[in-house]
Curated annotation (Swiss-Prot):
Annotated positions binding S-adenosyl-L-methionine: R36, G60, D81, L123
SUPFAM superfamilies, alphabetized: S-adenosyl-L-methionine-dependent methyltransferases
EC number: 2.1.1.222, 2.1.1.64
Protein's name in the database: Ubiquinone biosynthesis O-methyltransferase
Record's catalysed reaction(s): a 3-demethylubiquinol + S-adenosyl-L-methionine = a ubiquinol + S-adenosyl-L-homocysteine + H(+); a 3-(all-trans-polyprenyl)benzene-1,2-diol + S-adenosyl-L-methionine = a 2-methoxy-6-(all-trans-polyprenyl)phenol + S-adenosyl-L-homocysteine + H(+)
UniProt-listed GO biological process terms: methylation
MF terms in GO: 2-polyprenyl-6-hydroxyphenol methylase activity; 3-demethylubiquinol 3-O-methyltransferase activity; polyprenyldihydroxybenzoate methyltransferase activity
Keywords: Methyltransferase, S-adenosyl-L-methionine, Transferase, Ubiquinone biosynthesis
PANTHER family tied to this protein: METHYLTRANSFERASE, UBIQUINONE BIOSYNTHESIS O-METHYLTRANSFERASE, MITOCHONDRIAL
Function: O-methyltransferase that catalyzes the 2 O-methylation steps in the ubiquinone biosynthetic pathway.
Pathway(s) this gene product operates in, as recorded in its UniProt entry: Cofactor biosynthesis; ubiquinone biosynthesis
Length: 240
């Protein structure tokens, strides 16, 4: 069963050339990218004593904002996306800047072989796919035993609707209108339910909050009402 939502692909294909334009449609991702990157690296370093040979899978990599920066930090990254135009943009940037990322046009379910990775990353993707539970299970199957995953998405709350859609899309113009569908936002409890009866443990939920007074994004232990990270670990024994 495919995780691809054709309407979502068409929407992102129209702006796929803009991934590396900090003032363009993906400008907000450039603003939060440093804090996303730092969070990912912090979790990797806290989990693994030796990070020299780790293999990372970036699912739904877009134009390569995270994959590029992780590669520049010395990690071995495979990055996949369902849109060829996203992969083309990512490859063009990597080639121009002599950065070696293994980019592949693929969905998580189409990814060849049964290879597993030390770290699986999926940022701001799950709220754009079809068949979310199957997508999630395919995602965690790609984690090695004792490996980790970091996912980010948007909570389905009134606050998220007001800030993530009304404010971000229609008032502030941080992202294009109709980028998000409120019905596809995910509550943390729904992610817990998807992973029941598996060998996956949710270790941490961490909010990503805009501090209006200081005009910056910060991590929060308490506020997961809008944007949040899910940090997962995979046990040795279990179903997945």
């Amino acid at each position: 069963m495919s995780s691809v939502n054709k309407n979502e692909l068409e929407k992102f294909e129209k702006i796929s050339h803009s991934w590396w334009n900090k003032d363009g449609e993906f400008g907000i991702l450039h603003r939060i990218n440093p804090i996303r990157l730092n969070y990912i690296i912090e979790k990797i370093k806290s989990h693994y004593n030796d990070i020299s040979d780790l293999e990372i899978l970036d699912v739904g990599c877009g134009g390569g904002l995270i994959a590029t920066n992780l590669t520049m930090q010395g990690f071995n990254v495979t990055a996949i996306d369902a849109l060829q135009s996203n992969i083309d943009t990512a490859l063009a940037y990597a080639t121009e800047n002599n950065i070696k990322v293994n980019y592949l046009k693929s969905t998580i379910e189409e990814l060849e072989n049964d290879k597993q990775y030390d770290v699986v990353i999926c940022l701001e993707v799950i709220e754009h796919v079809e068949n979310v539970q199957e997508f999630m299970l395919n995602l965690v199957k790609r984690i090695k035993p004792k490996g980790i995953a970091i996912i980010s998405t948007i909570n389905r709350t009134k606050k998220a609707y007001l800030l993530g859609i009304i404010a971000a899309e229609y008032i502030l113009g941080w992202v294009p209108k109709n980028t998000h569908d409120y019905s596809k936002f995910l509550k943390p409890s729904e992610i817990y339910e998807m992973l029941e009866n598996t060998n996956i443990e949710i270790e941490e939920l961490k909010g990503l909050v805009y501090n209006m007074a200081e005009d910056k994004w910060v991590l929060s232990d308490d506020d997961i009402d809008v944007n949040y990270f899910v940090y997962l670990k995979k046990n040795v024994l279990g179903v997945i």
